[in-house]
């Protein structure tokens, strides 16, 4: 029913009850455990545990923890994990708890046809039992709250963040709501506190090779290596609850039953070809069509699309410029070699704001990209010439550098796509790239924010550390691609980079690149939710 969350915060009610977003933190789990551990009294006469009723008159439904019959009258009981409020005459029920029990009383009256004059709340944190007198004032407030809930349920727009910032500190949905990030925009010199998680909490599993088989034993995922004779050579065991996603490279064997189980556990599954291309995936798409309605409405407006595209292209070109500047700092000869390329990128940056169409932005971006990739070989002077590129080549890549970079971009595509779907947006409806291939436009849009930091810098750093050998590549006349050992190496480099932390210059807290991808998707959603101006503001130092 959500009455309690509505009185706590209207935005919380909307996220949970309308958009269907539920995040279970320690407090939520503790509340569930409390209700599971409550044992009924041996003498259960005149008592019903867990009474559920749907009212056609009020158009709400509710589940009462317990109803007890005393002197011929039914009394609704509610259990709370926390502590009672300290009043002038002793323990009192919190306002939201009073309203919740009153709504239960209204449901019980409709179900029994009898007047309900009182309810009780057990606060287990303070061990207090508080009596609630169901008077006309409480009934009136409960009915007004129900009407407000109905009104919010028909809206496609989220309510604003709570004015009382203390409410947000203990809210399980703060990482979705991002109230602190909103206050950074709306309040001058506001110092946000971190409510968004810093790092990923689970393991991303990558499985390579046709000789690999994915199975399940109890609540453990097994990755078995099978020889040509059918014998098991070795196996890897990972607890299901520790897996963030399963990524299958090549023709690894996985049964439909295993896929069904992973989906039921809300674990995404992704497939890559033996050549390293992203094929597709099964992502858990959360409920809440309101998010996609807001997305579609916003991105059909040319002014919004162009404004977002300018932010995106500016962020990408500036990242390319800053990386070249940083990599050539203190190296006069190398800086001189790249100066003309730096000038081209600087010139493009000056023209972004005056661009009046996506095609102009594409021209600026393309010119900057050619200059950027022309300058990258200067950063690899002491490396094996075998690994030094001659510009950017793709579909197919012509050299080991471009083959590795294309594979890293495929891994990035997967990460961005998974984050977009997890947030509840539609990856096929973007604002900059046009749908000209199987690649989804919004994924391509958001990838631009991370190509330099997650892929380009990672690859160049690994080449300068001499991490690659000839056996990591398979070379033909017309194409170069990574061998299995090369794809494993690139994957390890990418996943390690995702865990690196970086301080966001606007929200002023550090988080991993893995979390940064999710944060940017959520900040993008704020652009058309009345809370704009943080999306695509992060820059390399």
Curated annotation (Swiss-Prot):
Family annotation (CDD domains): Cas1_I-II-III
Catalytic activity: exonucleolytic cleavage in the 5'- to 3'-direction to yield nucleoside 3'-phosphates
Alphabetized UniProt keyword annotations: 4Fe-4S, Antiviral defense, DNA-binding, Endonuclease, Exonuclease, Hydrolase, Iron, Iron-sulfur, Magnesium, Manganese, Metal-binding, Nuclease
A biological process term (GO) from this entry: maintenance of CRISPR repeat elements
Claim: Disulfide bond is one of the keywords in the record: no
Region (CRISPR-associated endonuclease Cas1): 204-541
Residues the record lists as binding Mn(2+) 2: 365, 433, 448
Residues binding Mn(2+) 1, per UniProt: 65, 78
Coiled-coil regions, chain positions: none
Cofactor binding mode and count: Binds 1 [4Fe-4S] cluster per subunit.
InterPro entries: Cas1 (IPR050646), CRISPR-assoc_Cas1 (IPR002729), CRISPR-assoc_Cas1_C (IPR042206), CRISPR-assoc_Cas1_MYXAN (IPR023844), CRISPR-assoc_Cas1_N (IPR042211), CRISPR-assoc_prot_Cas4 (IPR013343), Dna2/Cas4_DUF83 (IPR022765), PDDEXK-like_dom_sf (IPR011604)
Positions of [4Fe-4S] cluster binding: 9, 168, 171, 177
Entry's Gene Ontology molecular function annotations: 4 iron, 4 sulfur cluster binding; DNA binding; DNA endonuclease activity; endonuclease activity; exonuclease activity; metal ion binding
Entry's EC annotation: 3.1.-.-, 3.1.12.1
Cofactor(s) essential for the protein: [4Fe-4S] cluster; Mg(2+); Mn(2+)
Chain ranges passing through the membrane: none
Listed Pfam families: Cas_Cas1, Cas_Cas4
Top-rank taxon: Bacteria
Region (CRISPR-associated exonuclease Cas4): 1-179
Functional description taken from the UniProt entry: CRISPR (clustered regularly interspaced short palindromic repeat), is an adaptive immune system that provides protection against mobile genetic elements (viruses, transposable elements and conjugative plasmids). CRISPR clusters contain spacers, sequences complementary to antecedent mobile elements, and target invading nucleic acids. CRISPR clusters are transcribed and processed into CRISPR RNA (crRNA). The Cas4 region acts as a ssDNA exonuclease, while the Cas1 region acts as a dsDNA endonuclease. Involved in the integration of spacer DNA into the CRISPR cassette.
Similarity remark: In the N-terminal section; belongs to the CRISPR-associated exonuclease Cas4 family.
Assembly and interaction partners: Homodimer, forms a heterotetramer with a Cas2 homodimer.
Protein name from the UniProt record: CRISPR-associated exonuclease Cas4/endonuclease Cas1 fusion
